[in-house]
Amino acid sequence: MTDAGKTAFTSSPAYADWIFVMKTWGDGLRKAGIGKLAPGERTDRLLRSVSGSLAKAGNLEVLGRGSSRIAFRFRKDPKFALKVASNSEGLAQNEAEYANAAKAGESYSCFARVLDFDSLNGAFMACDCCPQTTPADWVRVTGLPIESVLDIVDCAVSGKVSLKEIERQCSLGWDEMSSWFAGRFPPAKLKAVAGFCRNAVSSGMLKWRVFRDMIRFYFDNGNQAMLMADMGGYANWGVLKGQAPEQDAIVIIDSGLGEGAV
C-alpha cells in the first residue's frame, strides 16, 4: 500500500475489515439457477446463501443491498483468507505468502479470482480488486467516504465510444486522457476511472486485447458500463506475477457481468 493510500485508508473506520460488493447477475448465477429469478429475488437468495456460509465464521455485517448488488463487511480472518487461497485455481502454493502477510499485519486482499466457491452453491465467483487505482486512491482523489465503493464500482461511460478511440486515449498522457473522459464520467470519479484505464493498459497488467473484448461485450449488449470490478480481476493476475505491488484490503467479489447500480 502506498503511503498516501495507507493514510486515506487507515483513517476509515472500515480499515480492519474487508468490504465485499457482490453482484447477483452473471453466467455463473444463471447456471446455478439464481439468474432466472427476478432481481429482488436474486438478491434475497444470494444474501441467504452468503449469510448461511460466511456467518458461521462470525463478524458478517450487511452494509447495503439493491436489486442487483449486495455490500457486506467481513472482518479480516487469516484462516478464511488461506482457505479461499487454497481453494483457488493455481493458488495453493501461495498459502505461505498469505500466512506471512497475516503475521506481519499486511493487507493481503489481492488473491485473484476464486473459482467455484462451494459455499456459494457452486456459483462462479471472482474476487477482484484494482491494484493500480485502488479504493484508497478513490477516497483520496474524490473525497468520498469508503462506503461509496458501491457507487465507484458502477462508474460508467455515458454513451458508445469507438474501441479505437479508447485504445488511443489509453496511450496518452494524464492531461489528454482526463480531458477526453470529461463528460463521460461524474466529475468526482473522473480521475480514478481514467487513471485505472491508462495505468492498467500501459503497465501491461491488462492486455489491450482483453480490455477491448471486455468493452465490446458491454457495448454489444447495450450496457456501456465499464465496471471496475470486472477489469480489476484481469489486472489482478499481474499482482500475483509480481508485476505490481499489493496495496489495499478492500475486495470486490463479482459474480459476473452485472447491470445497473444498487
Segments the model singles out, each with a brief description of its role:
Residues C110-M205:
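Conserved structural core of kinase catalytic domains
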Residues R73-F74, V84, A126-C129, V239:
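Conserved hydrophobic "DFG−1" position in protein kinase catalytic cores
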Residues G5, P13-D77:
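ATP-binding glycine-rich phosphate-binding loop
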Residues F217-L227:
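Protein kinase catalytic-loop region centered on the HRD/HxD motif
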Residues M226-V262:
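Catalytic activation segment of kinase domains across protein kinase-like and atypical kinase folds
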Residues E89-E97, A136-V141, A261-V262:
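Active-site-adjacent loop/helix micro-motif of nuclease/hydrolase catalytic cores
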